[in-house]
Amino acid sequence: MIELDYVKGEDTIVEATSTSPWLMRSPLARAAEKRGSGLFFDINEGHGQHRDVIVAYGVSKPKRRSPHPHGNKAADKRKTTEKEPERKKRVGAPRTCKKICIQLLYRFNFTVLGIGNVCNIDLLLGTVSATNAI
């Protein structure tokens, strides 16, 4: 088993991207770093036959695109006053967070109990296998 840097206790949250070099080497973790998503793992020790339990929280921080240097001249000329319809916000964990959980299941035989996003909306998955966790 891989040892993680964490302190035992309630609500222990480990920033896996910075404290665990084995996760940093993962291409999914590197993609998450580039995209600006922070991934946090809550690690609890299992008892008896239970394996280690990881609860992952994905915090999505999309990078802002810089405006085009020449600007959008056609749009400036139109000067539309119509409001754009608001996009529906996705509820649940960011995709990258789920992917890394699946990867952890495959590589280290961890049991993933819950995946949450920045709003801490937990998708309680129970003891999941790599096939039905998506």
UniProtKB/Swiss-Prot annotation:
Residue numbers spanned by region Disordered: 59-92
Biased composition (Basic residues): 61-71
Basic and acidic residues: compositionally biased ranges: 73-87
Alphabetical GO biological process terms: regulation of ergosterol biosynthetic process; terpenoid biosynthetic process, mevalonate-dependent
Protein name: Uncharacterized protein YPL062W
